[in-house]
C-alpha cells in the first residue's frame, strides 16, 4: 500500500485556461462541465488522466481539460489511445469522439478498440450531424434529414 495521499480536487482543478470555442447553445458545453465535475470523484491524480481526440467539434475537448491530452487525426483517437494504454496501463485513458469522427471515418478503429477490450473510456458525442462542417449528415443522422449538404434529405433508397 502506498503512503502517498491522492490530492483532493474540485471541478475547477480540471478546467483549463483555454477559451471554449463551441457554438452558443451546443450540448458539448454540458458534457464538458459534467466531465470536469465528475473527474474528482475518481480519486486519482490529475496526472493519471489522458484525453485523446480526433477531429470535429468534440475533439477540442482535450484543450479544455487541465490534464494530459492528444488531438490526433480524423478517426484515429482509439488507435492512439490504445497505444497510450499499452505503454502506460495504470493511466485512465479517455477517447473523446463524435458520431462522425468515431463511427464514420474512425469506425474501424472504434470497432477494433472494442474488440480488443482494452481498459479505455469512450465518450462519444452524438449530435447526429457533422457539426464542424454544419451540414453533412453523419452515420447517426435520421433518415430524411435535410441539411445544407442534403437539401432534399437523406434517402437511403436514392443512395443505393
Which residues fall in each region the model found?
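Thiamine diphosphate
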Residues: 57-131
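Conserved small/polar residues in nucleotide/adenosyl-binding loops
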Residues: 157-160
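Active-site diphosphate/adenylate-binding microenvironment
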Residues: 12-73
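Cofactor-/ligand-binding subdomain signature composed of acidic, glycine-rich
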Residues: 1-15
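A short, structure-level motif marking secondary-structure boundaries and short turns
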Residues: 7, 20-21, 66, 93-95, ...
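Class I SAM-dependent methyltransferase SAM-binding "motif I" and its flanking Rossmann-like core
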Residues: 130, 134-137, 143-154
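Short secondary-structure transition/capping segments
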Residues: 93-101, 139-148
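Glycine- and other small-residue-rich loops at beta-strand/loop junctions that grip anionic moieties
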Residues: 24, 99, 153
Amino acid at each position: 500500500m502506498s503512503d502517498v495521499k491522492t490530492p483532493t480536487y474540485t471541478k475547477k482543478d480540471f478546467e483549463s485556461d483555454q477559451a471554449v470555442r463551441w457554438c452558443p447553445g451546443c450540448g458539448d458545453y454540458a458534457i464538458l462541465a459534467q466531465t470536469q465535475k465528475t473527474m474528482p470523484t475518481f480519486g486519482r491524480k490529475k496526472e493519471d488522466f489522458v484525453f485523446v481526440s480526433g477531429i470535429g467539434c468534440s475533439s477540442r475537448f482535450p484543450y479544455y481539460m487541465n490534464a494530459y491530452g492528444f488531438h490526433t487525426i480524423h478517426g484515429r483517437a482509439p488507435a492512439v489511445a490504445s497505444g497510450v494504454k499499452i505503454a502506460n496501463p495504470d493511466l485512465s485513458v479517455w477517447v473523446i469522439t463524435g458520431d462522425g469522427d468515431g463511427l464514420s471515418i474512425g469506425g474501424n478503429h472504434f470497432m477494433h478498440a472494442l474488440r480488443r477490450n482494452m481498459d479505455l473510456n469512450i465518450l462519444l458525442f452524438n449530435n447526429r450531424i457533422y457539426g464542424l462542417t454544419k451540414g453533412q449528415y453523419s452515420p447517426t443522422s435520421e433518415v430524411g434529414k435535410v441539411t445544407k449538404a442534403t437539401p432534399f434529405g437523406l434517402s437511403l433508397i436514392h443512395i443505393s
